[in-house]
Each structure stands twice: as structure tokens, then as C-alpha cells.
């Protein structure tokens, strides 16, 4: 995570940005935590969505354990983790959610697969828990009630360690910002505050 955060700072330096707002979703939220804990003077406001601090604050579901599964089986398991309500009956009762059921199966691209595995390894060892009090930015932490990848308790843990933070929970899973129409509006409003 430290390298991802350093890359973000290098890009900001190249663009001439002394400080900036940050939006981190899932793995990006892990990177954002590392960024704000390591470079607190660079982050003005930050939104963390469906993410985890690692360590004693709670880790996200160990997705690396699914890497060896057949791609279609992995997609089916991932679906249930992404929203714990998703089962056959749910999709019968909520046909509008059928799009979530279509598995994204990527095969044949060895560089993509290699990148995915390296990302899984990075998140496997993510732990910024002890350094979260270093974060000085105003932070909105948001979780989906039915997220089986980054459970709400993990977002609440993050909020407990950052002095200037607000925790909100939305009706949805790991993609709550698509499922709950109020989420994106509130995220944008938070980032637009002076």
C-alpha cells in the first residue's frame, strides 16, 4: 500500500497539487488510508467507501483465498460476498438487480491475471490501524449494511480512530453507492464542502 500511496503523491507533485480531496473505494480505500496516514498534510477531505483498516480494526474478506477457484465459481462466491442478501430468491423478487448476477469472468489475459494476484497480495497484508490517528483530514466513512467483503464493523472501526470523521451506513452491499441513491449525493456533497 505504501508504494500506491507514494505513486499518488508523485502524481500530485507532478500536477502541482499541494493538497487535495481523496475518494477511496474498496482497495482504493485501503490506499487512501495509507495516503492520509503517511502524508496527512496533503489530504484536505477524504471519503472512504466499503473498505477496511486491517490489523486490530478488522480486515476485509480474504479474497486471495478465492484465487485458485474456477473463474465461474469464484464469480458466484464473490457475488454472495458483495451483497449478503443475494441469493436465488432475492433475484426472483428483485429482477432489477439481475445485472449484479452476471459474472465478470476474465480468462486468457495473463498480465491481467498477474495484476489481480498482486493486488490480492497487497490487500492481504494491509494494516494501517495503528496509524489512523495520524489522519488530520475530515473523513466520511461509508459502508453498505449487507457488505460481506468489508463489513460495516470495519468502517465503524476506522471512524473510531480518526478524530474528524463521520460514519454513515447505506442500504446495499459492497456496491452500496450504486444501490442506495442517497449515497453518491452525500459523498459529492461532503467533498464539495469548503
Language-model regions, residue ranges each:
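Acidic catalytic loop of the alpha/beta-hydrolase fold
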Residues: 145-150
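Active-site loop/oxyanion-hole signature of alpha/beta-hydrolase fold enzymes
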Residues: 1-23
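Conserved alpha/beta-hydrolase catalytic His-Asp/Glu region
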Residues: 57, 78-124, 131
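Gly/Ala-rich beta-loop-alpha elbow adjacent to hydrolase catalytic centers
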Residues: 24, 28, 32
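Flexible "cap/lid" loop of the alpha/beta hydrolase fold
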Residues: 33, 37, 44-73
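Short alpha-helix in the alpha/beta-hydrolase fold that links the catalytic acid
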Residues: 128, 137, 151-160
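Short beta-strand/loop motif that positions the catalytic acidic residue
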Residues: 135, 141-143
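Catalytic active-site module of serine/aspartate enzymes centered on a nucleophile-bearing elbow/loop
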Residues: 164-194
Amino acid at each position: 500500500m505504501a508504494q500506491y500511496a507514494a505513486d499518488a503523491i508523485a502524481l500530485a507533485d507532478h500536477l502541482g497539487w499541494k493538497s487535495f480531496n481523496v475518494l477511496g473505494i474498496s482497495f482504493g480505500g485501503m490506499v487512501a488510508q495509507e495516503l492520509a496516514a503517511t502524508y496527512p498534510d496533503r489530504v484536505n477531505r477524504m471519503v472512504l467507501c466499503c473498505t477496511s483498516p486491517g490489523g486490530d480494526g478488522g480486515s476485509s474478506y480474504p479474497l486471495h483465498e478465492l484465487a485458485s477457484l474456477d473463474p465461474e465459481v469464484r464469480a458466484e462466491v464473490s457475488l454472495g460476498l458483495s451483497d449478503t442478501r443475494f441469493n436465488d430468491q432475492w433475484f426472483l423478487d428483485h429482477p432489477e438487480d439481475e445485472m449484479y448476477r452476471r459474472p465478470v469472468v476474465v480468462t486468457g489475459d495473463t498480465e491481467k491475471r498477474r495484476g489481480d494476484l498482486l493486488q490480492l497480495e497487497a490487500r492481504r497484508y494491509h494494516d494501517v490501524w495503528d496509524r489512523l490517528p495520524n489522519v488530520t483530514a475530515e473523513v466520511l466513512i461509508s459502508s453498505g449494511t449487507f457488505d460481506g467483503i468489508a463489513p460495516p464493523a470495519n468502517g465503524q472501526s476506522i471512524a473510531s480512530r480518526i478524530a474528524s470523521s463521520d460514519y454513515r451506513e447505506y442500504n446495499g452491499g459492497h456496491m452500496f453507492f450504486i444501490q442506495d441513491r442517497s449515497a453518491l449525493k452525500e459523498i459529492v456533497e461532503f467533498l464539495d464542502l469548503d
